[in-house]
């Protein structure tokens, strides 16, 4: 199956499919005429006498230097190679595929001035599985993601490196093995390819998709913890949340209420419970998780716009002029990444407090210490809770906003930058930490519910426990725990736990 992209109106769901499923993509042929028209206009400008940035001039601080018409193609090649300054581990294949798809969307709007053969090469590389080797670090998020996108472009011109069928090869060899030929860049094409926010945006989208799946699962584990602790579902009453009015809170409250529906554990303490109120980590879940859902949705709107944007420079406008602007500045992406980081941090923080509640016999309303069946002889989930605290703390440290950390670059020509790529890239580690925290809560919540037998939980939560137990056996006595924690985190990350819940209960990214 090939995804057909309509540049300017590619929805979030399509971007998610590209990221998760690695499907090949193509630009809708209806956009080809606009692409070719802009390319023809760039060719005219390159042949003319008027200096236009990036077409017949140098770059950045060297923009005042005029380039002769005979050197325009050499200029584009020379632009790519010294910009390949990335460091660190290669970005994963699914991230690079998303970067390339986003670049197609941007170029496909017909304002960048690249020829159709540049578009078709990217499409063919995605179809045949030629994945440029892009190091993870090196972009400040203005002027676009220059270093990472230069590594992408290097593979296209037969330089740099690329992965093909699991092998890391030179760009030329990877293209050759796939039956493809390198492109010879024409005027402005190198600049159009490396100038843009596609790396930052792809990383932020990956963080968003991972964070949203974790947020949905955190509502499930939060409901499990509520039942395990014999908490009240009264704070999830719909009218409470309607009176405040925040959409995320309303949706989170509804999800928690529905997940707990029919629990025999809940019915058992409706009368005669001496506790007047539960701790905040139980009672305020709709307020906290709902606020996180709201900012994830706001970030999603920003990133969907950015994914469809033209972010190189200069741009060919509708009147045929090539005009320099600043769409390459990734401040919107940086802000979105910072928002996602805050949500990830807070979802993990309140989840960790519920884990701590369940292992503490002074708070868990009758559960044994650390959920060990023979406390003292067994330590139960004592150190699993400590691990969750370590992960929570690391996420707090990483949640500092990257967008406020501008520094001048390129001899002060590029004197304010977004740091969007740094802000987006850290989301991969933060969401991995969050998956592990929520996985630990799944283990504590499920075990806490099991320790309430013969009382049973709701039908929805019983499905979650069954999915967990298919991979992780219930804890009867102390055993090696690292494999349990890894398996539980994977069930969060791959959507297994959220996938067993009936449709319509868990909130979507689109409000």
UniProtKB/Swiss-Prot annotation:
The protein's Enzyme Commission number: 4.3.1.3
Entry keyword set: Cytoplasm, Histidine metabolism, Lyase
Catalytic activity from the UniProt record: L-histidine = trans-urocanate + NH4(+)
A single GO cellular-component term on record: cytoplasm
Domain of life where this protein originates: Bacteria
Any GO BP: L-histidine catabolic process to glutamate and formamide
Pathway it works in: Amino-acid degradation; L-histidine degradation into L-glutamate; N-formimidoyl-L-glutamate from L-histidine: step 1/3
Key word Cytoplasm present: yes
Location of the protein in the cell: Cytoplasm
Per UniProt, location of the 5-imidazolinone (Ala-Gly) cross-link in this chain: 142-144
Major enzyme class: lyase
Modified residues (2,3-didehydroalanine (Ser)): 143
Keyword field contains Protease: no
GO molecular-function term, one example from the UniProt record: histidine ammonia-lyase activity
Post-translational modification: Contains an active site 4-methylidene-imidazol-5-one (MIO), which is formed autocatalytically by cyclization and dehydration of residues Ala-Ser-Gly.
Major subcellular location class: cytoplasm
Pfam families according to UniProt: Lyase_aromatic (PF00221)
Similarity section: Belongs to the PAL/histidase family.
Name assigned to this protein: Histidine ammonia-lyase
Organism: Brucella ovis (strain ATCC 25840 / 63/290 / NCTC 10512)
Organism lineage: Bacteria, Pseudomonadati, Pseudomonadota, Alphaproteobacteria, Hyphomicrobiales
The gene coding this protein: hutH
């Amino acid at each position: 199956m090939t995804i057909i992209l309509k540049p300017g109106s590619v929805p979030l769901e399509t971007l998610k499919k590209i990221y998760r499923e690695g499907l090949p993509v193509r630009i809708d042929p209806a956009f080809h005429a606009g692409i070719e028209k802009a390319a023809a206009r760039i060719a005219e400008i390159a042949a003319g006498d008027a200096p236009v940035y990036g077409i017949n001039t140098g770059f950045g601080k060297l923009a005042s230097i005029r380039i002769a018409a005979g050197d325009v193609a050499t200029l584009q090649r020379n632009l790519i190679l010294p910009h390949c300054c990335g460091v660190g581990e290669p970005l994963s294949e699914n991230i690079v595929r998303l970067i390339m798809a986003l670049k197609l969307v941007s170029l496909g709007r017909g304002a960048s001035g690249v020829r159709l053969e540049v578009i078709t090469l990217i499409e063919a590389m995605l179809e045949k599985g030629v994945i440029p080797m892009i190091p993870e670090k090196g972009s400040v998020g203005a002027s676009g993601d220059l270093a990472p996108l230069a590594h992408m472009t290097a593979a296209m011109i037969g330089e740099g490196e690329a992965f093909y069928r699991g092998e890391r090869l030179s760009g030329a060899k990877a293209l050759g093995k796939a039956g493809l030929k390198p492109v010879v860049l024409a005027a402005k094409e190198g600049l159009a390819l490396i100038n843009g926010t596609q790396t930052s945006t792809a990383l932020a989208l990956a963080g968003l998709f991972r964070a949203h799946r974790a947020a949905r699962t955190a509502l499930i584990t939060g409901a499990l913890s509520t039942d395990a602790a014999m908490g009240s579902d009264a704070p999830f009453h719909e009218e409470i949340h309607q009176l405040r009015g925040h959409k995320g809170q309303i949706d989170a409250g509804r999800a928690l209420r529905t997940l707990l529906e029919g629990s025999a554990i809940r019915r058992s303490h409706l009368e005669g419970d001496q506790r007047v109120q539960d701790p905040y980590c139980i009672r305020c879940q709709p307020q906290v998780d709902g606020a996180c859902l709201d900012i994830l949705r706001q970030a999603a709107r920003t990133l969907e716009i950015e994914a469809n944007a033209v972010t190189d420079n200069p741009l060919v406008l509708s009147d045929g002029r090539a005009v320099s602007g600043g769409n390459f500045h990734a401040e919107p992406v940086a802000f979105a990444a910072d928002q996602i980081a805050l949500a990830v941090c807070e979802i993990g923080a309140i989840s960790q407090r519920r884990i701590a509640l369940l292992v503490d016999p002074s708070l868990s309303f009758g559960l044994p210490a650390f959920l060990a069946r023979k406390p003292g002889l067994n330590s139960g989930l004592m150190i699993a809770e400590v691990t969750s605290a370590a992960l929570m703390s690391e996420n707090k440290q990483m949640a500092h906003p990257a967008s406020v950390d501008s520094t001048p670059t390129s001899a002060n020509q590029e004197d304010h930058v977004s740091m969007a790529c740094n802000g987006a890239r850290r989301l991969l580690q933060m969401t991995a930490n969050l998956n592990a925290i929520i996985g630990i809560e799944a283990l504590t919540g499920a075990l806490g519910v099991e320790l309430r037998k013969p009382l049973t939980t709701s039908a929805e939560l019983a499905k979650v426990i069954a999915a967990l137990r298919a991979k992780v056996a219930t804890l009867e006595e102390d055993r090696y725990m690292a494999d349990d924690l890894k398996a539980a985190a994977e069930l969060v990350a791959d959507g297994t736990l959220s996938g067993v819940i009936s449709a319509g209960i868990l909130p979507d990214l689109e409000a």
